[in-house]
Amino acid sequence: MRQRVVRHVDARGVRVGWANGARDDARRRRRRRGGGGGDGARAVRGEDVYDATYAMRDRDYALDIAERSHATRARAAGDEWFYGELAYGDARRVLRRAARVVGWDDDDAESTSTSSTAGEFVDLGSGMGKMVTCAALTGLFARSRGVELLPELHDEASAALETFYERVRDAGMSVECSISLSLGNLLTFDVSNADVIYIHATCFTPELLHATAMKLANECKSGTRVLIMSKQLPEGWVFEAFDGGYMALAQPQTHWKLDCWMYEVRRGSSSS
């Protein structure tokens, strides 16, 4: 049974999402290749649902909410409040790679993996909830969870989640994934059952990065995969690079890409 967080959000001004020409070209290619079925067709429908959900909630809109929240009451040090997100196509690609999907870079590949797909995705600092819904749309996770520190951003993400469910129904899709968004501190959020963890750490202070690394090292099960943006975790401890350990991922509304460092938690054969 899906988990939903219902919040009342005041009406805001309409902001139309930025259209990426390269993304649209890729979508048209997937439509031609995918035909009436297969993972390529599902990827296109998922992207349509995603775009419809966040059409009025683009990156600049979310950044404005985060900035105003921080100005009203600072809950994070320095620029830790700063908002960032990934373009849908690259978010999907890196999630498929982390979930061990064979042919992760090909949307026409079958959605099968070398391990169970009934796992859990966690976004530490989930913002507008976009990675959480993207993970749900991949069909690779049984649960997709996020935690956000800023109340105003969490409220908007909760409203967007309601829109997401509406768009899924409108598209005649079925998303077999339990989705939850929580308000709270990432350092106290439960990650013990997570199979894939995503952290947009571009503006993390050294102190927060260290605390996050300690949390993951102490709480994650062996085999958990961690995707962290713009920052690196200390290798040779419990964090080992997997599958090359790196991807450059696109952001919406800019041509600049961000570094994504990819790790797997390894505790040895005697650890669980």
Please describe what each predicted stretch is.
Residues M1-A11, A26:
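N-terminal chloroplast transit peptides
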Residues T117-G127:
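Conserved class I S-adenosyl-L-methionine
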Residues T205-G268:
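C-terminal substrate-binding/active-site "lid" region of AdoMet-derived donor-dependent transferases
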Residues L187, S192-E207:
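A short SAM/SAH-binding and catalytic strip from SAM-dependent methyltransferases
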Residues R143-E148:
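Conserved SAM-binding motif I beta-strand of class I
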Residues V9, G13, G17-G21, G38-T117, H154-V191:
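S-adenosyl-L-methionine
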Residues G129-F141:
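Conserved SAM-binding loop of SAM-dependent methyltransferases across substrates and taxa
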